[in-house]
Each structure stands twice: as C-alpha cells, then as structure tokens.
Amino acid sequence: MIEFVKGTIDYVSPQYIVIENGGIGYQIFTPNPFIYKKNSKETIYTYHYVREDTNALYGFSTREEKMLFTKMLNVTGIGPKGALAILASGDPGAVIEAIENEDEAFLVKFPGVGKKTARQIILDLKGKLADAVPEIAADLFNHEEREQIHEAATALEEALEALRALGYSDREIKKVQPHLKKEEALSTDQYVKKALQKLLK
C-alpha cells in the first residue's frame, strides 16, 4: 500500500496530476488538480482504489482529506468521483455540519448526490467523522497559495473543464460562467473555488 508519494509535479489536467518520483510518473486523481503547479515539489497522500474494472490512485494534500475520502467511499451510492466532488467544495466544515444536522438540501447540491444518497450519507456518517478527523476545521482544504502563471482566459477555461470533470452539467456551468467572467484575473484554482461557492449556494 502506498501511503504517500513525494516528488515533482510533472503534469496537471482537469482530472488528475502526474507526480514524478525516481523516474516514475504516478497518475493521481485529486479533488482540485489546479491547486498544484507544474515543477513544484509536493507530498501527496494516496489511496489505492482497486475494483474489478478499476485500478487507480487518488491523492490529497493532507491525511485529513484522505481520511474523509475513505469515509465517503464507505457510503452506499458514493464512488470515488462523487467523493472527490464533495471534497472539492473546499469547505469540509460545512459538509460535516450538514451531515450532523441532517441537512439533505445541502448535500444534494453536489453532483451525483440525490435525496436517497444524501440520506444514506447521513445514516452512515453522522457522529462518526469527528472521531475520524479530530483536527478538522472549516478551512481544512484552503491549501497554501500556489502561484499560478496563467492568462485569465486560459485559467477560466481550465476551471470550466475541472467542473465538468467533477460531474457538473453544462447547464449548471453556464449558470455560473457569467459570474466568473466578472471576476478580475484569477488562477484556475480560484475560479474553481468561486464557481463551487455559487453552485453550492
């Protein structure tokens, strides 16, 4: 089992990153790949997901993120893609609060989460996340700023691709696109966070 990979970011796409270590490039799916900058040195905490038709590495900037991901995978109806979309929201405190308060209306805002799955998340995880992630705080996923060198148009397009990769529909993306265009030049990561804030309202 690979606990983490420490190396250099070789490639960043809307769905995954490639981190090079010892001449080997590891393809790792992450909640928001654009928080990483090419050629930066990173430590990625990994989860090896193996099923009959799938063999993939999922990676996170902190062990807490990884633990939340594994908890989400234990919920019936939540797969890796759904768990990544929830983690990409950038506000784990709000997610945990929604689970503890049985706020189904908040949970169904995530792509792929309907009322039945939201209820299952609450049934399976209520009262259990605090023990799994004792140090969790509302800004857990607000990672250290990584400077982005992108023109605004390119960053916005990458952000829209990232939203599609997370499972948001073109209709949902078109709703937030005008708001994003009004923003001053942002990095791809910042555009994604702004979009998720709008989508989860």
From Swiss-Prot:
Q: Is the keyword Cytoplasm in the record?
A: yes
Q: Name one GO cellular component term.
A: cytoplasm
Which Pfam families does this one have? HHH_5, RuvA_C, RuvA_N
According to the record, the residues making up region (Domain III) are 151-201
Q: Where is this region: Domain II?
A: 62-140
Entry's SMART domains? Answer: HhH1 (SM00278)
Question: Which portions of the sequence form the region Flexible linker?
Answer: 141-151
Alphabetically, which GO biological process terms does the record hold? DNA recombination; DNA repair
Which of UniProt's keywords are assigned here? Cytoplasm, DNA damage, DNA recombination, DNA repair, DNA-binding
Q: Name one GO molecular function term.
A: four-way junction DNA binding
The family line of this record is: Belongs to the RuvA family.
Oligomeric and partner information:
Homotetramer. Forms an RuvA(8)-RuvB(12)-Holliday junction (HJ) complex. HJ DNA is sandwiched between 2 RuvA tetramers; dsDNA enters through RuvA and exits via RuvB. An RuvB hexamer assembles on each DNA strand where it exits the tetramer. Each RuvB hexamer is contacted by two RuvA subunits (via domain III) on 2 adjacent RuvB subunits; this complex drives branch migration. In the full resolvosome a probable DNA-RuvA(4)-RuvB(12)-RuvC(2) complex forms which resolves the HJ.
For this entry, the protein name equals: Holliday junction branch migration complex subunit RuvA
Record organism: Bacillus licheniformis (strain ATCC 14580 / DSM 13 / JCM 2505 / CCUG 7422 / NBRC 12200 / NCIMB 9375 / NCTC 10341 / NRRL NRS-1264 / Gibson 46)
The UniProt gene name for this protein comes to: ruvA
